[in-house]
Amino acid sequence: MTVQDLPVVNATLNAISTCFIVGGIIFIKRGKKTEAQIRDGFLCNNSKFHEEKLLHAVCMITALIVSAAFLTCYLIYHYSYPTTKFTHEGWPKIIYFIILFTHIPLAILSLPLIILTVIPAIRRKFEKHKRFARWTYPVWLYVSVTGVLVYLMLYVWFPATGTQ
């Protein structure tokens, strides 16, 4: 593998991160439902609730590690190669730049948001964690999905002449 292979690696890491972000949200929402059932007397055993919280944590930690790997590969690639230009005209170019110009500022915002969300979770301050997560989750998910879309538009659907 060479540095030239990093765009596909980056897209793959973003796609994997997306899956774990979605999985983490599904598990925490299922955990909330289980918690409500325990509170309302429908369930007496809270082991299911703790299992869902643990699965949420595993998914989110995995998403964080995969995203950190992505950021490392992204910085290596962009340090080594110039920016790839989108060369198509018409509606593909309009859609590409709409996606790109929303992706970039949200990607920049996502790093501090993720940090501000993870730190309270590590410190077991879950109310503060939830307050930040309400903002972090949609931003992180959007950035992960649009990162894959940017790759697909640049290298697969509308590649410049001479690219793969």
Model-derived segments and their meaning:
Residues 1-164:
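Alpha-helical membrane insertion/targeting regions
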